[in-house]
Amino acid sequence: MKNLSKFTIASLILFLFLAPCAQASKPVRIATIGASPLINKNQSPEALVEQMISFWQGQINQVINSKLDLIVLPEICDVPVGLSTSEQKIYVEARKDKLSDFFAKIARENNCYIAFGSLHNTDKGLRNSLILLDRAGKIAGTYHKNFPTIPEMEQGVIPGDQSPIFQCDFGTIGMAICFDLNYDELRAKYAQQQPDIILFSSVYHGGLMQSTWAYSCRSYFVSAIGVVQLPSEVLNPLGEIVASSTNYFNYTLATINLDYELAHLDYNWDKLKKLKAKYRDAVSIHDPGKVGSIMITSEDKAISALQMAKEFDIELLDTYFDRSRMFRKKRLEKAL
C-alpha cells in the first residue's frame, strides 16, 4: 500500500464504494432468431456465400431496430442446408471469413453482441462452434461443441473439451450446442460456474432439458433453433419460458434483468413479505409454483437483489441446500 499513488488509492476507494451498486438492475435486450438458410445450391460456392449473406440480412432486419444488446443465431448458420459432405467442404473453403465479417459489421454498426453457429476449419481441424462477437465486431469468445453426434465426428468434426465463460459488458455467458444438452457432465460444469446467461444454438429443441439446464445452472437460457417449426425461446433461471418465437414469427425479443437471486420459501416467508413491503415496485418476487424456489429481482438502479436479500437475512437457494446437506451429514453421523 505504501507504494501506491494517492490517485490509485483514491480510485480504489471509489471503486469499492460504487461496486455494490454497479450490479443493481441490469436489463439486457435480447433477440433470438430461428431459421434455416434454404437456398439454391446449384451455383458456384461464391454465389452461395452471397445468397447466405442476403438471407441473414433479411432475417436480422426483422429485429435490428429494437436497440438490442445481443442477437443469438442457430447452429452452423453460416452453411446452407442440404449440402453433401463434399459440397460443404468446398463451400467452407470458398466462404472463408465472409459470413463472420458480415456478422461483425452488423454488430459494429448496431452496437450489439452477436452469437452465431459456425462450421469452420481451425488449426486442430474442423469445428462446430458458437462464436460470440462483441459490440465492436471483434471475437469475444468461441465455444467448440463438446459432444458432436457420431455422424458429425465421422465427417471430421473435432469435439471441444472446454466450457468457457465469457464476460460481456452486461454479464457472463456460457454456451452449448445441440447434442450437448444431453450430457450432464457439461451441464454440471456450468452449474458450478453459474453464468448469467446460457446460449443454446441448435437444430434440435431439447424439450424439458432446456428447463433443467436453466434451473440447475441458475441462469437465463436463450435458444436459437435452426428448424423454423420449433420455437426459439428465452427461459428464466427457474426454467420458465418468458419469450418464444411462434408459427407466425420465427424470432422473439425479450428484455431480461440479470440482477436476480434465487431463494427457497423455507425460513423466508416473513422476510420476503417485509422485503416487498419496503421496496414495493423496486423488487420483484416471482414464484413459479410447485418447486418451492422463488426469484428475487431488483428493479432499483442503486440497490442490488443480493443487497436486498442480505438486508432481510434471506437465505439464498444454494446456501440453503448446502446447509441442508450439512445438517443431514451430522444427523447421519449421530445415528451411526
Regions found by a protein language model. Name each.
Residues 121-193, 202, 208, 216:
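Active-site catalytic loop in hydrolytic enzyme cores
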Residues 1-10:
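Bacterial N-terminal signal peptides that target proteins for export
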Residues 9-19:
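Bacterial N-terminal signal peptides
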Residues 18-26:
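Bacterial Sec-dependent signal peptides at the C-terminal "C-region" and cleavage site
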Residues 36-52, 154:
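Acidic/histidine-rich helix-loop elements
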Residues 95-113, 181-288:
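CN hydrolase (nitrilase-like) catalytic-core segments centered on the catalytic cysteine
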Residues 46-135, 205, 212-217:
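Cys-nucleophile CN-hydrolase/nitrilase-fold catalytic domain and related Cys-dependent amidase chemistry
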Residues 259-336:
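A short C-terminal boundary segment appended to hydrolase-like catalytic domains
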